[in-house]
């Protein structure tokens, strides 16, 4: 079995949970902070965000954007869009990564963060583990922009 099954937040397809319970604004903010810093170590990171129509998607979009920009990343919003479009835009427009805010087929009160790497594929488990470590650690563990 892969180590991913023992991860605290990320599962087989991103970070999902009931909005404001298992997945909250601080989780999204800190995920954004980490991704903005991680992809911005060698150049100014370019990260695109898409979302579904769930009410909580709007607050998660704002929290991610705040975290990303606090780390110096340029953020591009696709707003409401289908999940595959984020992968397509990341790949064709040379973004460092993309984030889709959606819990797919899960109930309306759930939501999720699906992080897509620069090749348009699911983010590597090693990076997801580092995001989890940062979420559970101090905010100042990485520098602000």
Give residue ranges: language-model regions.
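An N-terminal, well-structured beta->alpha segment
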Residues: 2-66, 70-71
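N-terminal small/polar loop signature for handling phosphorylated ligands or for N-terminal nucleophile
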Residues: 46-110
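Generic alpha-helical secondary structure signal
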Residues: 26, 84, 125-129
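Fold-independent oxyanion-binding glycine-rich loops
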Residues: 12-14, 52, 80, 101-104, ...
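Bulky hydrophobic/aromatic "packing anchor" residues in well-ordered structure
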Residues: 13-15, 86, 131
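Gly/Ser/Thr-enriched, mixed-charge loops and adjacent short helices
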Residues: 3-5, 18, 113-145
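Structural signal for hydrophobic packing residues in well-ordered secondary-structure cores
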Residues: 36-39, 68, 72, 90, ...
């Amino acid at each position: 079995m892969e180590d991913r099954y023992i991860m605290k937040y990320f599962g087989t397809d991103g970070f999902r949970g009931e909005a404001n319970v298992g997945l909250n604004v601080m989780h999204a903010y800190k995920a954004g902070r980490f991704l903005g810093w991680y992809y911005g170590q060698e150049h100014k990171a370019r990260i695109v965000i898409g979302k579904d129509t769930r009410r909580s998607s709007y607050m998660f979009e704002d929290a991610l954007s705040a975290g990303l920009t606090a780390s110096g990343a340029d953020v591009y919003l696709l707003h409401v869009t289908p999940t595959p479009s984020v992968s397509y835009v990341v790949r064709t427009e040379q973004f460092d990564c993309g984030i889709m805010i959606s819990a797919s087929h899960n109930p309306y009160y759930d939501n999720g963060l699906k992080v897509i790497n620069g090749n348009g594929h699911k983010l590597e488990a090693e990076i997801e583990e580092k995001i989890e470590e940062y979420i559970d650690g101090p905010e100042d563990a990485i520098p602000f922009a």
